[in-house]
């Protein structure tokens, strides 16, 4: 019984399905409730530009507010920025890691004859805007890393996002993923920007208090 209780306690408050790596983040900060349309538009553009300046980011698309809906209302001061970040290594058309040709100086060779620094072993190298079509596939070569040396995990990318999106009058946001966040919203059934949890011993009294 003790052993069974230990395993039950260990897995309490956990879901059967583990958290998936979606390859993207959902940034949901908010600004001042009284801010106008033009101000919210300006802040949203600043957020998009700040996130896009991170080398590991592929695309970022943001929006302010949502249409008036009883299911999921959101004012203009609530932002949603969907951020797609690059995979750690360059992938081929099948979505698998591909090795690319390097020369004797450990530089990646491009199809046009140019050479670029290898981000795998160069600490201070600036990542170049290199497309997969520019590199030469070679099974004896090396993987081309899309992330800087100091970026070792998606958490590091999120920390960079938090750092660059610290704007006056804008709140911070927890680390979210788009699909995971939508599933949580559907499970909770929240239909307002703010919710109150009511607990008690009698369901009828809880219902009466909530209504």
Regions found by a protein language model. Name each.
Residues 2-11, 26, 39-59, 74-211:
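Surface-exposed amphipathic alpha-helical segments in non-transmembrane regions
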């Amino acid at each position: 019984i003790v052993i069974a209780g230990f395993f039950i306690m260990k897995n309490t408050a956990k879901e059967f399905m583990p958290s998936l790596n979606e390859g993207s983040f959902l940034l949901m900060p908010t600004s001042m409730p009284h801010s106008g349309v033009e101000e919210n538009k300006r802040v949203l553009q600043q957020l998009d530009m700040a996130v896009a300046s991170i080398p590991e980011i592929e695309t970022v698309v943001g929006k302010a507010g949502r249409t008036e809906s009883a299911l999921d209302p959101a004012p203009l001061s609530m932002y949603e920025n969907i951020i797609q970040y690059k995979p750690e290594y360059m992938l081929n058309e099948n979505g698998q890691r591909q090795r690319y040709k390097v020369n004797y100086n450990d530089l990646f060779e491009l199809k046009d004859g140019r050479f670029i620094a290898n981000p795998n072993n160069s600490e201070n190298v600036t990542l170049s805007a290199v497309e997969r079509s520019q590199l030469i596939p070679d099974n004896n070569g090396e993987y081309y890393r899309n992330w800087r040396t100091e970026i070792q995990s998606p958490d590091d990318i999120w920390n960079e996002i938090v750092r660059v999106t610290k704007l006056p009058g804008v709140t911070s946001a927890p680390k979210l993923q788009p699909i995971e966040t939508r599933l949580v919203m559907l499970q909770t059934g929240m239909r307002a920007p703010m919710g109150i949890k009511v607990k008690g011993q009698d369901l009828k009294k809880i219902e009466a208090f909530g209504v």
